[in-house]
Amino acid sequence: MQSVALVFFLLGLLFTGVLGTETRLLFFWPGAALLGLAGLVATLRWRLRVLFPPSDICLATSVLFTGYVASRAWLSPVAAYAREDLFILAGAWVVYMLTVTAASHPRWRVAIFAVLLTLVLGNLVVGFIHLSGNWQFHVVPFFLRSATEGRIGGFFANPNHLGAFFSMVLFLAAGFLCFGRGGAALKMCLGFLIISMMIGVALTASRGALTGLAIGAALFSLLALGIVWQTQRHLFWSLLGGGLVVSVLGGAVLWKVNEEYLRGREITSPMANDVRLEIWQAALAQHAQSPWVGAGSRMFYDGSVQYRSEKLPAYAGEALFAHNEYLQMLADYGWVGLVLLVLVIMAHAWNGLAFIGWFTRHRFLQTGRLMSNHLAFCLGALAALTAMLVHAIFEFQFHVAAPTLTAALLLGLLANPGFEGSERRSLRLPPVRLMTKILLGLASVLLITGPWFYGLSDYHVAKAQIAEAQKDAFEQSQELNAAVDKDPMNPEARYLRGLSLLGKLRADQRTPNHPVLKRATEDLAQAVKLNPHHYLYALALADAYDAQSRHQEALEQLHRALILAPLHEESRMALAVHWHRLGQFEKAEAAYLWAGEAKAMNEEGSSRWIDNYRLLLQHVALIRQSPPSN
């Protein structure tokens, strides 16, 4: 059964690496189901064959962090948002636990490494397709990649996340190249892939990934040279000199090859114009509302709107993520979440460093062999962890399944790097082992049931959006109906269906008792109930209430929207339209002019305050020109 669990595990990693590459769960569900099966089989097996003892301290910190994040997600104000973090967390826990336990045998770790290299090859192939000019290419038919042209993305929707994935796998490959067991042909292939990944990171033009790569490379070099100093001191100075020459020449070549590309990135998106500082201010403002436990899972979706900085350019889109995982952790999970995350990182990094020390002081003296896959993966995992943590200062890769699961794999390698013998006796915490198995079972059940209860609804919502883009109103309606039927608690499906129904009504059909209007109002009211923090839901419901002559209730929703989006043209303009419909022209004019002062403007080509204000002036002029009624 253990081998069956590991086969499902490898398939889950592969599917997630290809499909689980964006922040929504839509394409993660197949990989989630496979990982759930792997975890369930492992749980039923209960006593797994573990070749080496894992660190109970690492397991304890991971249990505390996972338990807290899962509990906070369960108690979050918007279940649909929390679901995204919860399922990625469950997948990460299964990956972590199976890496620590069932996959502790060297051959299974090599198999995991082979899956990662397969994903690297796939990402490089898709990256070449992007580089050839087909920037919107997506591996799933009928879906398009929405990222900016000029930056490769591989399987990922966001090029920065491809950079994160490459920088993690690159150091595992570098560790295997330097200290892993294998022939010359394998090492040559690894060297080629490492260079390809370095070029790939440069072609993503992700400055955060490049920074993480540089710092990770520095740590890798220091640790590798330290190992050589402890074990093969006669080679140290030769390797140091050769390493410096290769680093300088390699860096110069990479810079020259990608110079024009990186300069173009700086021209189109200069560092001086980076808006991250303003986004970070919004995250800190949300954190201040609930410092200890945060606002809840992914509540920065709406917090980025409510606490938007006035310094952001007026036409800048909504951030949705803090572009800094540590500030996002503070905003969503508070100080408790961040402190537990730091404990997890420290425990695993310490265990990895302890293994390197044990290997050089004990294992090497016993065997006389420096080549070791365990040493290779531990060294690579430490450098990859460092690169990942640096990159996380600028990005949100832990809100995407594939990089998160890769990070969980790195932590698993560090939690059980391969200690053996009696030279090092680790602290045993028996209750922790039981808790890890219970969490593994719960996470597995969640991953198996999630695609059925939520994945089908996500699928129908995506199909409805495709139908809308193709202007197929009937198909859109059918898909939205199916989405709501599959998951009645999906606020986005409710909102989209209510909005679609409102859009079908002609002016003469917007009467209080019209059945379509009633149905639209019910959907929008349910969407607001399920997610009272999304200002667009409140605005749509206000529009429906106005059509039903429920003007006071409409005004309440408009005031709610103004609290949720205080700087936005859309919410101010909706208030003006409300007064305009009621014939209160002075209030309407004041609201339109207030909308013109908004710090967050609607996109060009969409409904704008000035267009509606002109309609108001025309309306007033027509009224004045009309002869007075007797």
Name each region found by the language model.
Residues 143, 147-155, 213-217, 249-288, ...:
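Flexible juxtamembrane loops connecting transmembrane helices in multi-pass membrane enzymes
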Residues 1-19, 30-43, 66-73, 84-98, ...:
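Alpha-helical transmembrane segments of multi-pass inner-membrane proteins
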